[in-house]
Amino acid sequence: MSSESDTTIVEAIDEVLAWSSLFGDHMDAESVLRNLQVKGSINSILQAIESSPHLSIENDVVYSDKHDRNLNIKYSQELASKHFKETMEVLSILKSCEQITGLALTGSVAAGMNKDDGDVDVMIITKPGWVWRVRALAIYLSHEHPTGQLLCPNMVLSEDSLRFEKTVYTAREMMQIIPIKDSKGITKLYDENGWVKEILPNAQKKPSRPLSKHGDYPWWWRVMKIPLLGQIIESWEARRRIKQLKLTSTSNEALYSKSICRGHENSHKTRIEAEYQNVLEAIL
């Protein structure tokens, strides 16, 4: 007979697996713990699974009879690893940039899965006054560098504009990121969003992914760093890009300002939250 505590943990696990089913993902016990919205431990998860008729664990992966198994997950995981390796050189250039104080993998690759046509999404945190020049560098590398074609710098933020809205979606996305560089930028991100621990009390920042070398910058990057001229270019690039992006934007999730370039044009958050509610209602 299950205890009230076991029942609570089972319900919390059900919620996590409903979430992961939206992405075709299967989580190990540690990932389930990271995503639980109640305080728990690996032992409490294992005990709850043992007490539940619909939960099981195989090779440390937690399954539920309420959701289909993704038979292609190994291939998706191999793609994530492959795409990251293909992008390592261009990421190492960004990592070496002094104006970037935080760099992290986000999205599917950070979750450990990707599609054949998937990108490598990254979050870039810059020193104040550098968002649009750094974005220009990242976009240039994604288009012109031999290893940059998968790079998708869809979020470039100034380190003085790191507060996010308080939602389950945002909390999970934030705790899913894999840091590549943290010269106080990623640390500030978590400090500014301390509410994440209220939603995900067991979550810890993922360890950094090491990158050892870096390549050359385009010649014009030296011009961007000239003090007065660089500031003029930053203002000019910000004005023209913000105007251009706002004119073409079709998503209420996208945000463009002098200190934020959040190009979430596919309304991913809105769609996932709607699907999430439908899945939750179906299993209750």
Can you say where each PLM-predicted feature lies in the sequence?
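Catalytic core of pol beta-like nucleotidyltransferases
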Residues: E4-E50, S56-G102, T106-D117, T126-L284
